């Protein structure tokens, strides 16, 4: 435990500014007790870093207050500042730092399997090349979240203290994407599927090298589709990944299952029941999508009007209503009403809307269970990517819908019947086009807020989400309540997160150079990602 603490908790110098005066190399010489080795075994480093990644990407801060609200799955019940794009600087600084620590740990795992003085020991825990490949894959997954949140970020010079790089430059996002696809290609090609990746410590795939290979190539497809509006080679990247082997069913899903053991709870659960807070509920826009309802306030239609999604009762519980009839209290649980998105928490109607929405603390859905399985990337996600790759093909689209509904209803312990699944697939497949694929992908990506937010920015869908300036609700007095962000996003669902303020002092010159490349030369929320070419809130750019 001491060793894991060293890598995952103690501050690490990342080459982006000095966070501490003690290096990891010096820490390694502070304890020579053979019964308490300072060197972390590679299997423990993998398990510890996997958990740290999941704990911070799928949590009630970066995960819930940012990505899940940016994607309008969740909204806050108490303080709605983050819903309205006012981000706490301490949180922004903290997650930027934590995510880079995770990258460092994967670099360290690679070193443990390449350094001749350490590789022999690491081989006890799995094939060296397979361990390296798994570390590369996890590093790319984490890096993709970093760059898709902030844009241009340190990469090639990050974590290079031993090479006397104390302040890392910010790489262009275009170059980072090219590097990530290259890393995944190399990872896939070095995997020996006949040998274990890890004999223990791999929470995601239990050491199954064949599944790591499929994940590497499926993730290549995801990154390639991100580039569909800006890189004419995106189809080539996918074709090459398909040749190397991708997910074939839900059995290949990259997921992280938490435990019911004390400190191993899912962070969504901990944020509610360990911390004793009741902070979130489902949004009205997402609830309307699931219920097949049009947005009458903003005159937006629904492509599957009247079709209730079978995942509705998985993703949320209803609001429990109690009514007294005579001397008997009758409870009804059929009220599925989402909370209006982006209303100021100080508005005198806010408590009314909150009390109409589901109370997840009292009646928790599956994502608030102790051992919830968080989705990293799924077979359904891949099928929607392949549908788009094939010109929005119906076969892959339908397979994606089937896989998603089957996965979520099975995870919830109530698998959908074949007849009901067939009926739903038929109802949502009358017209398969860019909107249908994007909307079903959005529904599937619930709880994967980072990827859903990417897709919203890349495609401009779903149209049903509330844009700045649109009507969120109308009060009983007829007052119109609009979604009015606290930060300027030029009328768009938030395109990026500002660079953390710590970077301006710890890595000032490189920070300033990065800011100068943003729109208007300021550290803002409205500068777009390299792959985001939308020209307006309802623009749906064509693929190259």
Spell out what each predicted region is.
Residues 234-386, 390-444, 448-450, 459:
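Hydrophobic-face positions in mid-chain alpha helices that act as interaction patches
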Residues 178-249:
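Internal, well-ordered domain-core segments that constitute the primary functional module
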Residues 24-72, 76-85, 97-100, 108, ...:
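Membrane-proximal, proline-rich intrinsically disordered regions
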Residues 74-154, 160-199, 369-372:
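Conserved, well-structured interaction surfaces
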Residues 1-32:
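Bacterial Sec-dependent N-terminal signal peptides
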Residues 23, 266-306, 312, 423-544:
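Long, intrinsically disordered, low-complexity segments
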């Amino acid at each position: 435990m001491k060793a894991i603490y060293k890598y995952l908790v103690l501050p690490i110098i990342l080459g982006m500014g000095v966070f501490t005066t003690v290096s990891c190399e010096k820490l390694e010489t502070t304890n020579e007790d053979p019964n308490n080795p300072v060197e972390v075994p590679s299997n423990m480093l993998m398990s510890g870093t996997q958990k740290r990644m999941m704990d911070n990407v799928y949590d009630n801060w970066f995960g819930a207050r940012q990505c899940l609200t940016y994607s309008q799955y969740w909204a806050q019940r108490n303080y709605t500042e983050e819903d309205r794009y006012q981000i706490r600087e301490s949180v922004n600084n903290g997650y930027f730092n934590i995510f880079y620590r995770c990258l460092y740990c994967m670099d360290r795992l690679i070193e443990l399997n390449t350094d001749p003085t350490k590789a022999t020991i690491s081989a006890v825990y799995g094939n060296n090349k397979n361990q390296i490949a798994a570390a590369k894959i996890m590093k790319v997954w984490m890096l993709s979240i970093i760059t898709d949140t902030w844009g241009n970020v340190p990469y090639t010079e990050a974590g290079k203290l031993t090479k006397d790089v104390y302040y890392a430059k910010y790489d262009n996002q275009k170059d980072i994407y090219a590097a990530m696809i290259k890393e995944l290609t190399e990872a896939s090609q070095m995997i020996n599927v006949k040998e274990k990746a890890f004999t223990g410590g791999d929470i995601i795939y239990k050491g199954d090298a064949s599944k790591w290979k499929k994940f590497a190539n499926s993730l290549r497809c995801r990154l390639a589709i991100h580039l569909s509006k800006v890189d004419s080679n995106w189809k080539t990247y996918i074709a090459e990944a398909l040749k190397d082997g991708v997910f074939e069913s839900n059995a290949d899903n990259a997921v992280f299952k938490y435990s019911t053991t004390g400190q191993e709870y899912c962070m969504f659960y901990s944020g509610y029941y360990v911390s004793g807070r009741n902070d979130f509920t489902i949004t009205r826009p997402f609830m309307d999508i699931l219920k097949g309802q049009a947005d009458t306030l903003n005159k937006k239609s629904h492509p599957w009007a009247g079709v209730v999604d079978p995942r509705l009762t998985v993703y949320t519980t209803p609001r429990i209503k109690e009514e007294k009839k005579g001397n008997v209290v009758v409870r009804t649980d059929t009220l599925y009403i989402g909370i209006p998105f982006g209303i100021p928490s100080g508005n005198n109607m806010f408590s009314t809307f909150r009390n109409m929405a589901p109370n997840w603390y009292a009646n928790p859905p599956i994502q608030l269970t102790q051992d919830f399985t968080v989705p990293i990337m799924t077979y359904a996600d891949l099928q929607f990517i392949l549908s788009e790759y094939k010109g929005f093909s119906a076969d892959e689209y339908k397979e994606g819908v089937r896989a998603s509904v089957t996965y979520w209803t099975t995870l919830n312990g109530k698998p959908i019947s074949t007849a009901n699944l067939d009926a739903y697939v038929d109802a949502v497949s009358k017209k398969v086009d860019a909107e249908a694929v994007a909307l079903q992908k959005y529904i599937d990506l619930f709880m994967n807020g980072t990827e859903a937010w990417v897709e919203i920015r890349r495609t401009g869908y779903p149209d049903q989400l509330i844009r700045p300036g649109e009507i969120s609700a109308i009060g009983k007095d007829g007052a119109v309540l609009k979604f009015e962000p606290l930060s300027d996003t030029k009328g768009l669902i938030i395109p990026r997160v500002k660079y953390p303020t710590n970077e301006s002092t710890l890595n000032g010159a490189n920070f300033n150079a990065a800011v100068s490349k943003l729109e208007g030369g300021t550290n803002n929320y409205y500068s777009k990602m390299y792959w985001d070419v939308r020209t307006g809130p309802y623009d749906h750019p064509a693929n190259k």
